Protein backbone atom coordinates (compact mmCIF):
# COMPACT_ATOMS: atom_id res chain seq x y z
CA UNK A 1 0.00 0.00 0.00
CA UNK A 2 3.04 2.30 0.11
CA UNK A 3 3.87 1.78 -3.58
CA UNK A 4 3.53 4.39 -6.27
CA UNK A 5 0.41 4.15 -8.40
CA UNK A 6 2.30 2.67 -11.36
CA UNK A 7 3.19 -0.38 -9.24
CA UNK A 8 -0.45 -1.31 -8.64
CA UNK A 9 -1.33 -4.20 -10.95
CA UNK A 10 -4.43 -6.21 -11.77
CA UNK A 11 -4.85 -9.92 -11.07
CA UNK A 12 -6.26 -11.03 -14.40
CA UNK A 13 -6.95 -14.73 -14.04
CA UNK A 14 -8.75 -17.14 -11.74
CA UNK A 15 -6.67 -20.22 -12.50
CA UNK A 16 -3.75 -19.18 -14.69
CA UNK A 17 -5.32 -20.60 -17.84
CA UNK A 18 -7.22 -17.57 -19.10
CA UNK A 19 -6.29 -13.91 -19.05
CA UNK A 20 -9.28 -11.66 -18.58
CA UNK A 21 -10.09 -8.68 -20.77
CA UNK A 22 -8.48 -5.25 -20.44
CA UNK A 23 -10.27 -4.44 -17.20
CA UNK A 24 -10.93 -7.25 -14.75
CA UNK A 25 -14.07 -7.77 -12.71
CA UNK A 26 -14.23 -8.39 -8.99
CA UNK A 27 -15.00 -12.09 -9.44
CA UNK A 28 -11.72 -12.64 -11.27
CA UNK A 29 -9.80 -10.73 -8.61
CA UNK A 30 -11.30 -12.46 -5.58
CA UNK A 31 -11.46 -15.96 -7.04
CA UNK A 32 -7.94 -15.56 -8.43
CA UNK A 33 -6.34 -14.66 -5.10
CA UNK A 34 -8.56 -15.50 -2.16
CA UNK A 35 -9.01 -19.25 -2.50
CA UNK A 36 -7.71 -20.22 0.95
CA UNK A 37 -4.86 -22.50 -0.14
CA UNK A 38 -3.69 -20.05 -2.81
CA UNK A 39 -3.85 -17.05 -0.49
CA UNK A 40 -1.72 -18.86 2.09
CA UNK A 41 0.70 -19.94 -0.66
CA UNK A 42 1.06 -16.34 -1.88
CA UNK A 43 1.77 -15.08 1.63
CA UNK A 44 4.30 -17.85 2.28
CA UNK A 45 6.14 -18.10 -1.03
CA UNK A 46 5.39 -15.10 -3.22
CA UNK A 47 6.11 -12.07 -1.04
CA UNK A 48 9.75 -11.14 -0.64
CA UNK A 49 11.75 -8.24 0.73
CA UNK A 50 14.44 -6.82 -1.54
CA UNK A 51 17.20 -4.93 0.28
CA UNK A 52 17.49 -1.59 -1.53
CA UNK A 53 19.56 1.50 -0.70
CA UNK A 54 16.43 3.26 0.53
CA UNK A 55 15.45 0.31 2.71
CA UNK A 56 13.65 -2.99 2.33
CA UNK A 57 11.15 -3.08 -0.54
CA UNK A 58 8.23 -5.47 -0.10
CA UNK A 59 7.46 -7.24 -3.38
CA UNK A 60 4.35 -9.26 -4.20
CA UNK A 61 4.40 -11.51 -7.26
CA UNK A 62 2.17 -10.52 -10.17
CA UNK A 63 -0.43 -13.02 -11.37
CA UNK A 64 1.66 -14.18 -14.35
CA UNK A 65 4.68 -14.73 -12.09
CA UNK A 66 2.68 -16.75 -9.58
CA UNK A 67 1.09 -19.15 -12.04
CA UNK A 68 4.17 -19.48 -14.27
CA UNK A 69 6.49 -20.21 -11.35
CA UNK A 70 4.09 -22.81 -9.96
CA UNK A 71 3.95 -24.53 -13.34
CA UNK A 72 7.72 -24.34 -13.78
CA UNK A 73 8.29 -25.98 -10.40
CA UNK A 74 5.93 -28.84 -11.26
CA UNK A 75 7.74 -29.33 -14.57
CA UNK A 76 11.06 -29.26 -12.72
CA UNK A 77 10.00 -32.01 -10.32
CA UNK A 78 9.13 -34.24 -13.28
CA UNK A 79 12.29 -33.32 -15.21
CA UNK A 80 14.60 -34.26 -12.34
CA UNK A 81 13.15 -37.77 -12.49
CA UNK A 82 13.09 -37.87 -16.29
CA UNK A 83 14.99 -36.36 -19.20
CA UNK A 84 16.02 -33.12 -17.48
CA UNK A 85 14.12 -30.91 -19.93
CA UNK A 86 12.05 -28.44 -17.93
CA UNK A 87 11.11 -26.09 -20.75
CA UNK A 88 11.20 -22.39 -21.61
CA UNK A 89 9.95 -19.69 -19.23
CA UNK A 90 9.08 -16.81 -21.57
CA UNK A 91 8.79 -13.16 -20.51
CA UNK A 92 8.07 -9.91 -22.26
CA UNK A 93 10.46 -7.05 -21.54
CA UNK A 94 9.78 -5.36 -18.23
CA UNK A 95 7.50 -8.10 -16.88
CA UNK A 96 9.70 -9.04 -13.92
CA UNK A 97 11.90 -11.86 -15.20
CA UNK A 98 14.57 -11.47 -12.52
CA UNK A 99 12.01 -11.61 -9.72
CA UNK A 100 10.31 -14.61 -11.31
CA UNK A 101 13.68 -16.35 -11.09
CA UNK A 102 13.93 -15.38 -7.41
CA UNK A 103 10.46 -16.77 -6.64
CA UNK A 104 11.27 -19.93 -8.61
CA UNK A 105 14.55 -20.49 -6.73
CA UNK A 106 12.79 -19.96 -3.39
CA UNK A 107 10.00 -22.42 -4.13
CA UNK A 108 12.38 -25.06 -5.50
CA UNK A 109 14.06 -25.35 -2.12
CA UNK A 110 10.81 -26.57 -0.58
CA UNK A 111 9.84 -28.84 -3.47
CA UNK A 112 13.18 -30.55 -4.18
CA UNK A 113 15.69 -32.14 -1.87
CA UNK A 114 18.40 -29.52 -1.23
CA UNK A 115 18.83 -28.51 -4.89
CA UNK A 116 21.83 -26.67 -6.25
CA UNK A 117 20.78 -23.92 -8.66
CA UNK A 118 23.19 -22.76 -11.36
CA UNK A 119 22.29 -19.51 -13.12
CA UNK A 120 24.05 -19.15 -16.49
CA UNK A 121 24.18 -16.02 -18.64
CA UNK A 122 26.15 -15.01 -21.73
CA UNK A 123 27.36 -11.60 -20.53
CA UNK A 124 29.17 -10.32 -17.47
CA UNK A 125 26.80 -7.36 -17.06
CA UNK A 126 23.75 -9.64 -16.99
CA UNK A 127 25.51 -12.00 -14.60
CA UNK A 128 26.19 -9.07 -12.27
CA UNK A 129 22.62 -7.81 -12.59
CA UNK A 130 21.02 -11.12 -11.66
CA UNK A 131 23.53 -11.81 -8.89
CA UNK A 132 22.76 -8.40 -7.40
CA UNK A 133 19.00 -9.01 -7.47
CA UNK A 134 19.35 -12.43 -5.83
CA UNK A 135 21.72 -10.99 -3.22
CA UNK A 136 19.13 -8.36 -2.31
CA UNK A 137 16.66 -11.20 -1.64
CA UNK A 138 19.02 -13.56 0.19
CA UNK A 139 16.90 -13.62 3.35
CA UNK A 140 13.91 -14.77 1.28
CA UNK A 141 16.13 -17.37 -0.44
CA UNK A 142 17.52 -18.54 2.91
CA UNK A 143 21.07 -18.66 1.57
CA UNK A 144 23.73 -16.35 0.19
CA UNK A 145 24.18 -16.51 -3.61
CA UNK A 146 27.70 -17.10 -4.92
CA UNK A 147 29.25 -15.65 -8.08
CA UNK A 148 31.94 -17.73 -9.78
CA UNK A 149 34.95 -15.54 -10.51
CA UNK A 150 36.80 -17.85 -12.89
CA UNK A 151 36.74 -21.30 -14.46
CA UNK A 152 38.70 -22.73 -11.57
CA UNK A 153 36.35 -21.07 -9.10
CA UNK A 154 33.34 -22.58 -10.88
CA UNK A 155 34.94 -26.01 -10.70
CA UNK A 156 35.60 -25.69 -6.98
CA UNK A 157 32.04 -24.50 -6.33
CA UNK A 158 30.42 -27.39 -8.21
CA UNK A 159 32.77 -30.34 -7.91
CA UNK A 160 32.05 -32.33 -4.79
CA UNK A 161 29.13 -30.13 -3.67
CA UNK A 162 26.48 -32.38 -2.17
CA UNK A 163 23.61 -29.97 -1.60
CA UNK A 164 22.24 -26.44 -1.81
CA UNK A 165 23.86 -23.37 -3.31
CA UNK A 166 22.81 -20.73 -5.82
CA UNK A 167 25.77 -20.24 -8.15
CA UNK A 168 26.06 -17.57 -10.84
CA UNK A 169 28.34 -17.96 -13.84
CA UNK A 170 28.74 -17.10 -17.48
CA UNK A 171 28.77 -19.94 -19.99
CA UNK A 172 32.31 -19.02 -21.02
CA UNK A 173 33.54 -20.46 -17.70
CA UNK A 174 32.54 -23.98 -18.76
CA UNK A 175 35.17 -25.89 -20.72
CA UNK A 176 35.59 -29.29 -22.33
CA UNK A 177 36.60 -31.98 -19.88
CA UNK A 178 36.63 -35.76 -19.64
CA UNK A 179 35.20 -35.57 -16.12
CA UNK A 180 31.80 -34.04 -15.23
CA UNK A 181 31.64 -31.46 -12.47
CA UNK A 182 28.77 -33.28 -10.78
CA UNK A 183 26.57 -36.32 -11.38
CA UNK A 184 23.79 -35.23 -9.02
CA UNK A 185 20.20 -35.14 -10.31
CA UNK A 186 18.97 -32.32 -8.09
CA UNK A 187 20.91 -29.63 -9.93
CA UNK A 188 18.76 -27.11 -11.78
CA UNK A 189 20.36 -24.92 -14.45
CA UNK A 190 18.65 -21.64 -15.32
CA UNK A 191 19.97 -20.06 -18.52
CA UNK A 192 18.98 -16.44 -19.02
CA UNK A 193 19.41 -14.90 -22.48
CA UNK A 194 22.20 -17.42 -23.00
CA UNK A 195 21.13 -18.39 -26.49
CA UNK A 196 24.37 -20.19 -27.30
CA UNK A 197 23.56 -22.53 -24.44
CA UNK A 198 20.52 -23.81 -26.35
CA UNK A 199 22.32 -25.29 -29.34
CA UNK A 200 25.61 -26.90 -30.31
CA UNK A 201 25.06 -30.50 -29.19
CA UNK A 202 26.58 -32.14 -32.26
CA UNK A 203 30.27 -32.64 -32.96
CA UNK A 204 31.90 -30.67 -35.76
CA UNK A 205 35.08 -31.54 -37.60
CA UNK A 206 37.47 -28.84 -38.80
CA UNK A 207 38.24 -29.87 -42.38
CA UNK A 208 41.66 -28.21 -42.31
CA UNK A 209 42.94 -29.52 -39.00
CA UNK A 210 40.75 -32.58 -38.48
CA UNK A 211 40.05 -31.39 -34.95
CA UNK A 212 36.68 -32.31 -33.45
CA UNK A 213 34.86 -29.59 -31.51
CA UNK A 214 31.54 -29.38 -29.70
CA UNK A 215 29.23 -26.46 -29.01
CA UNK A 216 28.60 -24.62 -25.77
CA UNK A 217 25.38 -26.48 -24.97
CA UNK A 218 27.15 -29.86 -25.21
CA UNK A 219 29.97 -28.64 -22.98
CA UNK A 220 27.52 -27.48 -20.30
CA UNK A 221 25.47 -30.68 -20.47
CA UNK A 222 28.61 -32.83 -20.32
CA UNK A 223 29.71 -30.92 -17.23
CA UNK A 224 26.35 -31.51 -15.51
CA UNK A 225 24.95 -34.60 -17.27
CA UNK A 226 22.13 -35.31 -14.81
CA UNK A 227 21.02 -31.73 -14.24
CA UNK A 228 17.67 -30.31 -15.34
CA UNK A 229 17.56 -27.23 -17.57
CA UNK A 230 15.16 -24.31 -17.88
Residues of each region from the PLM?
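ATP-dependent helicase/translocase motor core
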Residues: 1-116, 125-141, 162-166, 186, ...
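Conserved helicase motor
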Residues: 124, 146-155, 170-176
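Conserved motor-coupling elements within RecA-like helicase/translocase cores
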Residues: 149-167, 180-181
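SF2 helicase catalytic motif II
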Residues: 182-228
Amino acid sequence: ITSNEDRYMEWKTKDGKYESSQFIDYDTFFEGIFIKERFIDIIKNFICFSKEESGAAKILAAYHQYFAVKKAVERTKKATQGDGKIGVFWHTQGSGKSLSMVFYAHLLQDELSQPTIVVITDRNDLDDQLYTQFSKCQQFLRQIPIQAKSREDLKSLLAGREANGIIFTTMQKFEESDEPLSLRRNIVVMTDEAHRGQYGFEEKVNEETGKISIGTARIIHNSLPNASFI
